[in-house]
């Protein structure tokens, strides 16, 4: 798939192949090799609208010199243009990713575009024999120090497949017990989360 793009030589592509060790290891490897200022994670089954990167660049201009921001974040949608998680009630919202869920109570996956330097600061933990670490383990840590600029534009088109990570989240947690215990234990200790969320995490932890 990638070879024809390399041969076209229209843009610079640094293609890295490694044994499947889970998405989190792929992200770590990508961050290690990344030379750009921003990092956009796009799953192999998904794609970007034609104006996606243009919209991202427009919003980056407003935060790129502000060290309190970890990046920008647009909305995800299905191929029919319906937003994942329903309506997004803001045009622009500057907040951290935990407050985004807990305070503003917004649902649905979002499309984060991170400053590469921030992801280098917060690499994903890796556990031998485990292939899954929920992204929230890292995103929640970043939220203690940085915020994101959320904007109400679809920049990412996705289809949730029956064998995808989101569809099988419980099974992935069972198959990666150390990573899952880390995730739940950190929520239990984190006062930013409401009591119900922390109780549910305690139940899942045990």
Name each model feature, range by range.
Residues 39:
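Short aromatic/hydrophobic "clamp" motif used to bind/position activated sugar donors
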């Amino acid at each position: 798939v990638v070879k024809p793009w390399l041969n076209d030589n229209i843009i610079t592509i640094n293609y890295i192949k490694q044994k499947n060790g889970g998405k989190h290891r792929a992200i770590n490897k990508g961050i290690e090799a990344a030379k750009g200022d921003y990092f956009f994670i796009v799953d192999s089954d998904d794609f970007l609208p034609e104006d996606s990167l243009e919209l991202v660049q427009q919003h980056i201009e407003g935060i790129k010199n502000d060290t309190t921001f970890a990046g920008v974040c647009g909305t995800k949608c299905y191929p029919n243009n319906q937003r994942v998680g329903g309506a997004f009630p803001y045009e622009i919202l500057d907040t951290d990713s935990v407050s985004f869920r807990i305070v503003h109570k917004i649902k649905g996956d979002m499309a984060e575009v991170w400053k590469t330097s921030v992801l280098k600061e917060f690499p994903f933990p890796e556990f031998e024999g485990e292939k899954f670490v929920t992204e929230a383990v890292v995103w929640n840590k970043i939220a203690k120090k940085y915020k994101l600029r959320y904007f109400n534009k679809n920049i990412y088109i996705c289809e949730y497949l029956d064998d995808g990570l989101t569809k099988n989240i419980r099974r992935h947690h069972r198959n990666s017990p150390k990573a899952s215990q880390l995730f739940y234990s950190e929520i239990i200790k984190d006062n930013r989360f409401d009591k119900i969320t922390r109780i549910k995490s305690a139940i899942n932890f045990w």
